[in-house]
Amino acid sequence: MNPRRKKRLGLILALVLGASATVGLMLYALNQNMDLFYTPTELVNGKPDGTKPEVGQRLRIGGMVVVGSVKRDSQSLEVRFQVEDIGPKVTVIYDGILPDLFREGQGIVAQGVLVDATTVKAHEVLAKHDEEYMPPEVAEAMKKTH
């Protein structure tokens, strides 16, 4: 084989190998940052396609906070509450300050790790507001103009 061809072949193989490694690392990083969304019913019973999350899996869960289920630890910021949709209830454990819009009977989305079949240890809780929500500043301005 001609030395020039040998050099070209080595360069092409190195480029293909480098591109493959780059794509592989990108797919691995995307997989690590992917959080699948579940409702409480899907978390307990599985999704319609039969997939069910495993213990230790990162996920997001969304539903309504069960009225009377919020329990606060007096010694720390830990809060436990239950979330439901139309089926079973799932317990969410969160250590931190809850959003201002967090209320019983209100919709939330919690992002965290599945601890057991019906418990999620959340590191982020987002409170949903209803479609009629209006920031206080806007409501005040509308009162003045109308």
From Swiss-Prot:
Instruction: For this entry, list what GO says about its biological process.
Output: cytochrome complex assembly
Cross-referenced Gene3D superfamilies, in alphabetical order? Nucleic acid-binding proteins
Q: Where is coiled-coil annotated?
A: none
Q: What SUPFAM superfamilies is this protein classified in?
A: Heme chaperone CcmE
- Segments in the Cytoplasmic topological domain: 1-8
InterPro entries on file: CcmE, CcmE-like_sf, NA-bd_OB-fold
Q: What does this protein do?
A: Heme chaperone required for the biogenesis of c-type cytochromes. Transiently binds heme delivered by CcmC and transfers the heme to apo-cytochromes in a process facilitated by CcmF and CcmH.
Q: Which family does it belong to?
A: Belongs to the CcmE/CycJ family.
**What is the name of this protein?**
Cytochrome c-type biogenesis protein CcmE
Name of the gene: ccmE
